[in-house]
Amino acid sequence: MNNIVHKLKTLVLNEAFGGVLLIVCTLLALLVQNGSFSEHYREFLNLKVGFSVGEFELNKPFLLWINDGLISIFFFAIGLELKKEFLHGDFKNPKNIVLPFMAALGGILIPAMLFALVNIGDAYTLKGWAIPTATDTAFALAILMMCGKHIPSSLKIFLLSLAIFDDVGAILIIAIFYTTKLSIVAFVVAGIAILAMLILNLLGITRKSFYFICSVILWISVLKSGVHATLAGIITAFFIPMQTKNGEAFLEEIYESLKFWLAFVILPLFAFANAGVNLSNIDIGAVFSGVSIGIFLGLFVGKQVGVFLFSYLVIRFKFAALPQGSNLKQLYGVCILTGIGFTMSLFIDGLAYEVSDIFNYADNLAILIASFCSGIWGFIYLKFFAARS
């Protein structure tokens, strides 16, 4: 009996199995949204959930709690893993930061340029230039994990590092180009929460409850500031101490405790809530519009070309080195996966075009097709053409 339980636990904690579950939830969301349960699906996502303390009230749809709340925990975990790499891993050398930073920059500039070239002359459609610049880290990482031992672990760290810069870029784009109102008061409160965590860290305090309270205050203030709340998860991670005063692995303990919830609750729920695009309303005739073509070219072509080109240049001119144990073929495979814009691209699409059906949902279809093509081609390439010998 114990042997069976052990095997089940091993399967459940297997990252590749988690990736499969993520894809299943994506397909399930598409089926539900386009089936007889579509109304219940929308009611579930629009259900208001909230709380109030005195005059303060936070009452938002369930979808927001998933996208801005639960997914912040995902970015918190990414931040924890990156901190380990910065302090004890490859990124202890500042030179190793150059590659993911430049890769992310290429993954923003080239897709935006392609979209702009296709839609030049139309001021309204050009508002969507940032749609193909995004990468859905959760899905890209899930596909990468499904490749198993075919690629070195250093490429996983490269993708995570690239994703941080990519997300920061997306947040800056949203804040500068798609945010109409920013709250200075909320920024001040966020600064106080960050200062409190810095003091806790410097004093070597490892009470989880203290960091939890500060992180909640930070999350709420970032949410109210007008900036995407997921940034709070990344910031919080950087202030978690590596170990207790007794030398126990504090950060590692927190990271390990999150693995199960991330792989089998948070990320599947995130996929189910965001992948439900209504395909019945899509006008096939609009599929070949400038917006759709720009999005597809930006995500499927622009992302992989931009990320790989900028990566190759900094490696070629010796400003950076390839991730340890990898080669250019494997690096290119990871670059393909950055074209999975999916939920983040859908999010920016909603900000860029306030009228959701202005293009008869062809823009949403373009995001789905480009993301699926990037995921499928990236998986096939990494699994069969770039396998480690």
UniProtKB/Swiss-Prot annotation:
What GO terms fall under cellular component here? plasma membrane
UniProt protein name: Na(+)/H(+) antiporter NhaA 1
Q: Annotated Gene Ontology MF terms? A: sodium:proton antiporter activity
Q: Where in the cell is it found?
A: Cell inner membrane
One Pfam family it belongs to: Na_H_antiport_1
Give the catalytic activity.
Answer: Na(+)(in) + 2 H(+)(out) = Na(+)(out) + 2 H(+)(in)
| Sequence similarity | Belongs to the NhaA Na(+)/H(+) (TC 2.A.33) antiporter family.
- Asked if the Swiss-Prot or TrEMBL record annotates the protein with the keyword Lipid metabolism, the reply is no
The domain of life is: Bacteria
Q: How does the UniProt record describe the way this protein sits in the membrane?
A: Multi-pass membrane protein
The family database entries (InterPro entries) matched by this protein are listed as: Na/H_antiporter_dom_sf, NhaA
Q: Which Gene3D superfamilies match?
A: Na+/H+ antiporter like domain (1.20.1530.10)
Spell out where the chain crosses the membrane: 12-32, 62-82, 97-117, 128-148, 157-177, 184-204, 220-240, 260-280, 282-302, 305-325, 331-351, 365-385
For this entry, list what GO says about its biological process. regulation of pH
Cited HAMAP family:
NhaA (MF_01844)
Q: What keywords would UniProt list here?
A: Antiport, Cell inner membrane, Cell membrane, Ion transport, Membrane, Sodium, Sodium transport, Transmembrane, Transmembrane helix, Transport
- Which gene codes for it? nhaA1
The family database entries (NCBIfam families) matched by this protein are listed as: NhaA, PRK09560.1, PRK09561.1
Its function, per the record, reads:
Na(+)/H(+) antiporter that extrudes sodium in exchange for external protons.
**Keyword Transcription assigned:** no
